[in-house]
Amino acid sequence: MRLEVFCQDRIGLARELLDLLVARSIDLRGIEVAASGRIYLNFSTLEFEQFSNLMAEIRRTPGVTDVRTVPYMPSEREHRVLSALLVAMPEPVFSVDLRTKVELANPAAQNLFNLDENKIRNFTADHLINGFNFARWLESERVQAQAQHVVIEGRDFLMEAHPIYLSEDNDQADQLVGAMVMLKSTARMGRQLQNLVVTDETEFDHIVAVTPRMRQVVEQARKLAMHDAPLLIIGDTGTGKDMLARACHLRSARGKMPFLALNCASLPDDVAESELFGHAAGAYPNALEGKKGFFEQANGGSVLLDEIGEMSPTMQTKLLRFLNDGTFRRVGEEHEVHVNVRVICATQKNLFELVQRGEFREDLFYRLNVLTLNLPPLRERVQDIMPLTEIFVARFADEQGIPRPRLSSQLNAFLMRYNWPGNVRQLKNALYRALTQLEGHELRPQDIVLPEQALDVSLGEEAMEGTLDQITSRFERSILTRLYLSYPSTRKLAKRLGVSHTAIANKLREYGLGQKRGDNE
């Protein structure tokens, strides 16, 4: 029988419960204490009257709020869930100790090697799988996850080997105790990849939108995606305009048709015209064959014209003519071609200002500015920074075949205080660089290299209150707080700011910026 006792945190309570069992000569088989104010007891089966009396005694014990029977102890439930999970997994999975000897194997692994549960424990991983030296891997100075193609019984598998670290108590560092090996059938993976098709809904799910303003943009995009009129997406560089454009295409009725993108920046007119409208054979000196342009290739689908604000006046005129009726002529041909294409444009410039300066056709502007989406910069999406960080870190760790690092407690404030002039693209690239150079299992502020001129040290109205000395002190403290994350020692920070080590040490002490033992080295 098993009981779950709900109780208060009181010294001696567990001993009193055990005394109740001893007084009744009840055979105790196990006791577990949970951190949530619960004690679990496992003892031999009792007669109904004896059991009822015991329950009443437990309820009368000071500090006990309730008691009930449960089918399993927490450890039993955890073991059963783990066993059920291993049994349900179609991929062969087994664990090994530091000598590479098999400790546990699921039924799929037993079937693959044609060994039952007892016999497979007599084998080592090196004996079961050729082509990978498990012993040498586990003896290496830094054991990291590995992935490798292996052949077993004439079948191709992707083998993934992950080290297992455990700690005996909270004060000790994790110790390597063995490894977990998973074998993924390449044939099965191929079938799974065929089913992994991006749909109109899943593409929008890839867009992180925690900030209310960004959520509003995504919801607006879902609605505008269903229309056929030209769509204009405005946003700073790196905000994800191309990703939003693709999501709108996939959600629309054209989602199964082609989606092509052309960057209009710095393209000569003849190249831009050929790319968009195509050309006939002989239209150019080296054009031996005719070529379909983007509009013709994407017939029935969508074309993204990125950096539309950089398009030349000549190409603006040709684009306007195409938008009127969907007809155009290939370069070097006389007959017209008609296609059905939705045009999506993206820009980081203010097209209305370009119109006023005479740099963008007014009629084209009003032709494009029918449905508009404005993407906010990352500095205005502060709540999205950490979710984006977690996604990028997980993705890059998987790509590089390394364990996913923990994010330090200081990293949140570090990333959210930065101005991010390059927006999401800059965050993505900074994290990729950090993971390629990462030492250890934790990502810290000093692992991320960012241009210092974009540090957010601006002062708002509240920071402008007080005397000049008070304002200066707040600004100085903000500078030191921010730079100390990237230069975490007084000597490094002093060298960075071009002052003496003593001056920096005094300033850090003055502003209460903590120093750890040895950080002045």
Swiss-Prot record:
GO terms for molecular function: ATP binding; ATP hydrolysis activity; DNA binding. PROSITE patterns: ACT, SIGMA54_INTERACT_1, SIGMA54_INTERACT_2, SIGMA54_INTERACT_3, SIGMA54_INTERACT_4. GO terms for cellular component: cytoplasm. ATP binds at residues 235-242, 298-307. Residues 207-436 form the Sigma-54 factor interaction domain. NCBIfam families: HTH_TypR, PRK10820.1. This is HTH-type transcriptional regulatory protein TyrR. The lineage of its organism: Bacteria, Pseudomonadati, Pseudomonadota, Gammaproteobacteria, Enterobacterales.
